[in-house]
């Protein structure tokens, strides 16, 4: 007789109401949109927990009106990992292997080097953890070159079984979260902006699920093709 408890869970996300908040011209950083989506994820999925490596105010990962998870409070839904990116992802791996929870934890994209070994293991074990990584370009503010990610995006994309999504606006951000929360085998890195980006006219939820799509077709003769992702899509559309 099998007396084991099955902790496997299915998480999902309905973004229909969220999308109404992001009309064409809506101007905000995708890290802020991500925070709004996280609240909806938490509302729709009681087994969802969110954390960060001591960067909650910058990466926008905190579930509002929820306590911190601790030995004194197992009901807390915010995970406080400290400045330990490798330990953060390793802990997420262990909790996900146990099953029963869906985990997200964020940091700066430039610090993804610190957790590379742990996220590589997550990919090998097909653990659907979520990593919202903000400050995705040279537009990171006053911190300078030490906080400007250059090679990290390519590094994450090169890991087999790793999903890397860099949304260009709020609509794509919500769509990216839907893919991440409904993933059952792939770790997902969500690459977020610090600076504001405008919601574009032809942003597509379905297009995000395909990995890439044409957001602006040529009007007449095609002289060149501009390929962009994330915050550069706004710039490309103005070129």
Predicted regions and their residues:
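Thiamine diphosphate
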Residues: 2-239
